[in-house]
Design a protein with these regions (language model features):
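Glycine-rich, proline-tolerant flexible connector loops at the mouths of alpha/beta enzymes
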Residues: 49-63, 157-165
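A cross-family glycoside hydrolase active-site/sugar-binding cleft signature
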Residues: 1, 51-53, 81-85, 104-106, ...
Length: 234
């Protein structure tokens, strides 16, 4: 996971976005510059996908599109999942047109379920849905969590209160979404991952994977742990 504010990678914690500060103290990289952070992540492990949250765009304070174009050019081996507060067809088309980008529709940004209905035609198999919660409160004005028939193949369960806190994934909510999603969809965890044991437990429950940042930067998920995980799920 890479969270962007004002052109820099920030340390996301508990969904309190106004309190996020540029990344510091990472064991991987001594910089908050996005290119340097991505290079450090790829030096740690040959990740094939990167989740990027444009927090400026999500909050209506500009966006990082030029940086996104740079990242797709510099790292063509990566598929970049981008949550940029997509709330219109034009914005969805713009992101879907970028090579290597998978647009993420965050439920917190959706006021009308019809965009998700139309998004399947606009982004096809690249579309990702993020079902967002803050604590027990769903951030879902359009009620997408109650419309599994509209969900695309990949669904993120984003528990913002757990992001950056090392408090563990919300296994109960993940289980519920996984049941609702059915066997044709993949469910991804976001928020709270502490280390290898959590990732193994998620895999055993049928969760496809997890979005992780803090555990990578503080060293709890290092090269050895990632290699073990890759071997066990191969």
């Amino acid at each position: 996971m890479v969270d962007l504010v004002g052109g820099l990678v920030v340390h996301a914690r508990a969904g309190e976005r106004d309190l996020y500060r540029p990344l510091a103290g990472s064991k991987l990289v001594d910089s908050a510059e996005p290119v340097a952070v991505v290079e450090a992540l790829l030096a740690l492990h040959p990740f094939r996908a990167l989740y990027l949250a444009d927090l400026d765009a999500i909050r209506g304070r500009g966006d990082h599109r030029p940086l996104l174009v740079e990242l797709t050019t510099r790292f063509p081996e990566l598929t970049i999942w981008v949550d940029a507060g997509i709330a219109s067809e034009d914005r969805l088309r713009d992101l879907a047109a970028l090579p290597g980008v998978r647009p993420v529709l965050g439920s917190e940004s959706q006021a009308d379920p019809r965009l998700l209905e139309r998004a399947h035609a606009l982004a096809s198999e690249r579309l990702v849905l993020s079902l967002d919660w803050r604590g027990e409160e769903p951030l879902d004005p359009a009620g997408l969590r109650e419309r599994p028939e509209l969900w695309p193949r990949d669904v993120i369960v984003m528990t913002l209160a757990r992001v950056g806190t090392a408090s563990g994934p919300d296994f109960a909510r993940l289980d519920a979404v996984h049941r609702a999603a059915g066997s044709a969809r993949r469910v991804w965890a976001a928020g709270g991952v502490r280390g290898l044991e959590d990732l193994e437990r998620l895999w055993e429950r049928g969760i496809a994977g997890a979005l992780v940042a803090t555990a990578l930067h503080d060293g709890r998920l290092g090269r050895t742990e990632l290699a073990r995980l890759a071997e066990s799920v191969a």
